[in-house]
From Swiss-Prot:
Basic and acidic residues composition bias: residue spans: 8-18
GO cellular component labels: cytosolic [4Fe-4S] assembly scaffold complex; nucleus
Cofactor requirement: [4Fe-4S] cluster
Protein name: Cytosolic Fe-S cluster assembly factor NBP35
Source taxonomy: Eukaryota, Fungi, Dikarya, Ascomycota, Saccharomycotina
Annotated region (Disordered), positions in chain: 1-33
Biological-process GO terms, alphabetical: iron-sulfur cluster assembly; tRNA wobble uridine modification
């Protein structure tokens, strides 16, 4: 059973302004967004606060995790969550590797469906919140496990999202050791991104994996995501181009659905001097596997998309090792 403070969240009354800086911020009660908030006078009259007392707890929890990867995209619908699920399955294919997936797309959680964990719930113990395990070495945490049903909307503003993300990072017990934590985020650069990068900064993030599709309308927003990473001092581990051509499951022929009118993801990486991890073809069976909550690699191991994804995962792990070698120089 989920902790009492997160039960029935779909019925929680929302009183915080849309761009609330948060009661712990130096700008609490002073921003334009605070005007009209019933708590404005309380926030603005508080004495300056010291460091967040939860940060040491977050650092202690995350220090048990070797590698932390953010999966980002500028545009929605490019397959970011789909790729997060496949990355998680691929890493967990090695039984000696412990993997955790954290779904921070608070208003649109989809990992539980893709990883076959819909309808599950969180359990609490003395050591924290227990993730839902979809395999012996693959655990998942998502707000979806706290909702009354799958159709319940989460209509939260920034401060509430910030609070839940803090609880996920502070209270989820991944066990004594985790090799990889893969964090799925919503599209764009929103409260979720600011919160997770702020809280994880001290303990260290290996970097971000950015997902795009070939067409320029997606690359426009990817450039903004890259700019966000650079301003937030998040290393970009690389970019993967998803839905890069359509492979017919019957004849194996390939055609371009989303044409790379400006050169696609590879050209973008060349221009911005970023690692290009590879391209994954559009295969309708990926969607079928995600809807069924099954590993695409188990169901379609010989498909071109399966080989392409595994190549991207290998390239990603190489980038992580390169980063570690540079730190040790």
């Amino acid at each position: 059973m989920a902790p009492s403070q997160v039960e029935d969240i779909s019925k929680t009354e929302l009183e915080t302004p849309e761009h609330c800086p948060g009661p712990e911020s130096e700008q609490a009660g002073k921003e334009d967004a605070c005007n009209g908030c019933p708590n404005q006078s309380i926030c603005s009259s508080q004495l300056p606060q010291g460091p967040d007392p939860d940060l040491p707890l977050i650092n202690k929890r995350l220090s048990q995790i070797d590698h932390k990867i953010l999966v980002l995209s500028g545009k929605g619908g490019v397959g970011k969550s789909t790729f997060t699920s496949m990355l998680s399955w691929a890493l967990a294919a090695d039984e000696d590797i412990e993997v955790g997936a954290m779904d921070l797309d608070i208003c649109g959680p989809s990992l539980p469906r893709m990883l076959g964990a819909e309808g599950e719930s969180i359990h609490q113990s003395n050591s924290g919140w227990s993730p839902v395990y979809v395999a012996d070495n693959l655990g998942l945490m998502s707000i979806s496990f706290m909702l009354p049903d799958a159709d319940s909307a989460v209509i939260w503003r920034g401060a509430k999202k910030n609070g839940l993300i803090k609880q996920f990072l502070k209270d989820v017990n991944w066990g004594e050791h985790l090799d990889y934590l893969v964090v799925d985020t919503p599209p764009g650069t929103s409260d979720e991104h600011l919160s997770v990068t702020t809280y994880m900064k001290e303990v260290g993030i290996d970097g971000a994996l950015i997902v795009t599709t070939p067409q320029e309308v997606a690359l426009l927003d990817v450039r903004k995501e890259i700019d966000f990473c650079r301003k937030a001092n998040i290393k970009i581990l690389g970019l993967v181009e998803n839905m890069s051509g359509f492979v017919c499951p019957n004849c194996k022929g390939e055609s371009q659905i989303f044409r790379p009118t400006t050169g696609g993801g590879k050209k973008l990486c060349e221009d911005l001097k970023l690692p290009y991890l590879g391209a994954v073809p559009l295969d309708p069976r990926i969607g079928k596997a995600c809807d069924a909550g099954e590993s695409f690699f188990d169901s379609y191991a010989d498909s071109p998309a399966s080989s392409a994804i595994l190549d991207v995962v290998d390239a990603l792990r190489d980038q992580i090792e390169i980063s570690l070698e540079k730190l040790n120089i």
